[in-house]
Amino acid sequence: MQIYLVGGAVRDQLLNLPIKDRDFLVVGATAKELINQGYQQVGADFPVFLHPVTQQEYALARQERKSGTGYTGFVCDFSPNVTLEQDLIRRDLTINAMAQDLTSGQIFDPFGGKTDLANRLLRHISDAFAEDPLRVLRVARFAARFHHLGFSIAEQTLELMQKMTACGELNHLTAERIWRETEKALHTESPHIYFQVLRKVNALAILFPEIDQLFGQIQSVKYHLETDRGQHTLLALQQAKLLVKQAHNPTALLWAVLCHDLGKDLISAEMLPHHYQPNVTGIQLTHQLADRLKVPTAVKELALLVNKYHTNCHKIAELDSERVLELFNQLDVWRKPQRLDDFLLACEADARARLGAEYCSYPQATLAIDYFNAANAVNVQAIIADGFKKQAIRDELNNRRINIIKQIKNAI
């Protein structure tokens, strides 16, 4: 029995990057032998074994044979006769198909992973890559993760990804797997690259048609030097990435920014850019996308609010006090003040996603916080003590909040 460190841990070690997870491969052993040594088996389809001391995961070497459509259509062989190279060849990219002997430290690299690391190249190992449609998303995610290091996708790999898209294999992916890869991609160093790659291989129109239709939609040059709405969205995503450490819910912030302009291309030209009324079409599209991918509720809710109200936030200094209070009520900031922070970050990312405005301040956020702090300080108990009852309490609370917002507005 031989044990190897495999996959991302070997790759990241060679790139001098922090190693987050360590995956171990066992060659020349059976499940029974591992169990007899104290390993605990977890999982049925792809058995993984927990080390009796470290609780780290160990997997038996395996071969795979395509038996159907989608990423689940495989027959696996876990026999002790499966070699290290036979296991590694089933992996997606050469840089993920290296193994390190735990005893000697020697690195096995049968497919040129080291060379591709040096050349900053994401390259598939063989045509068997096409057997798993999820790999289209995975490669896009790796491109997003390593873009800042200068990595690009090999032309042959891009061509194969395009063929996989064209043959309909992506239609077999479940919502859960699409969202899982996308959420990981959002938290890479360059999430916009994920969507650029998917668009380049024609997968964006299949997986994210609501996002794809933003590309080619022309914006007013007066307000957007980057006239394509899709490009503006990706610029906004880059800006959100710079702000994400301030977010209470980072995933929600990034997803909201991605969805903030959905449907805007369907608003009449006369209303742009001053369309302060809710974008009903955008709300529908944001709902549709989130529901199809089974996006978590909190993530979906912020995206809906940002899509609906971000233009109001940009013009908050021009809104009357009643509309400011209405905005706060719609955001439910009294019960969820952290949501206001993330909403404002999303609006700031949008405002800065204009060529030449990348490092501009966003005073609207400061004003919104001032309005909120003052309005939130209104004492409900004082209203009750003044004799107001039932619905009159709510009405008076709104009136006092409006008045204090008005005082701040008049003092500006």
UniProtKB/Swiss-Prot annotation:
Q: Which domain of life is it from?
A: Bacteria
The domain section of the record reads: Comprises two domains: an N-terminal domain containing the nucleotidyltransferase activity and a C-terminal HD domain associated with both phosphodiesterase and phosphatase activities.
Q: Which InterPro entries match?
A: CCA_bact, HD/PDEase_dom, HD_domain, NT_sf, PolA_pol_head_dom, PolyA_RNA-bd, tRNA_CCA-adding_enzyme
Q: Does the keyword ATP-binding apply?
A: yes
Query: What cofactor does this one take?
Result: Mg(2+); Ni(2+)
Give me the residues that bind Mg(2+), please: 21, 23
Q: Binding residues for ATP, per the UniProt record?
A: 8, 11, 91, 138, 141
Q: Which GO terms describe its molecular function?
A: ATP binding; CCA tRNA nucleotidyltransferase activity; cyclic-nucleotide phosphodiesterase activity; magnesium ion binding; phosphatase activity; tRNA binding
Cofactor detail note: Magnesium is required for nucleotidyltransferase activity.
The source organism is Haemophilus ducreyi (strain 35000HP / ATCC 700724)
The record's misc note reads:
A single active site specifically recognizes both ATP and CTP and is responsible for their addition.
| Annotated CTP binding sites | 8, 11, 91, 138, 141
User: Subunit structure of this entry?
Assistant: Monomer. Can also form homodimers and oligomers.
Keywords, sorted A to Z = ATP-binding, Hydrolase, Magnesium, Metal-binding, Multifunctional enzyme, Nickel, Nucleotide-binding, Nucleotidyltransferase, RNA repair, RNA-binding, Transferase, tRNA processing
Which reaction is catalysed here? Answer: a tRNA precursor + 2 CTP + ATP = a tRNA with a 3' CCA end + 3 diphosphate; a tRNA with a 3' CCA end + 2 CTP + ATP = a tRNA with a 3' CCACCA end + 3 diphosphate
Q: What is this protein called?
A: Multifunctional CCA protein
Q: Which SUPFAM superfamilies does this chain map to? A: Nucleotidyltransferase, Poly A polymerase C-terminal region-like
Ranges for domain HD: 229-334
What Pfam families does the entry give?
HD (PF01966), PolyA_pol (PF01743), PolyA_pol_RNAbd (PF12627)
- Family matches, as PROSITE patterns: HD
State the family named in the UniProt similarity comment for this chain: Belongs to the tRNA nucleotidyltransferase/poly(A) polymerase family. Bacterial CCA-adding enzyme type 1 subfamily.
Q: What does this protein do?
A: Catalyzes the addition and repair of the essential 3'-terminal CCA sequence in tRNAs without using a nucleic acid template. Adds these three nucleotides in the order of C, C, and A to the tRNA nucleotide-73, using CTP and ATP as substrates and producing inorganic pyrophosphate. tRNA 3'-terminal CCA addition is required both for tRNA processing and repair. Also involved in tRNA surveillance by mediating tandem CCA addition to generate a CCACCA at the 3' terminus of unstable tRNAs. While stable tRNAs receive only 3'-terminal CCA, unstable tRNAs are marked with CCACCA and rapidly degraded.
Query: Would the keyword Methyltransferase be found if you checked this record's keyword annotation?
Result: no
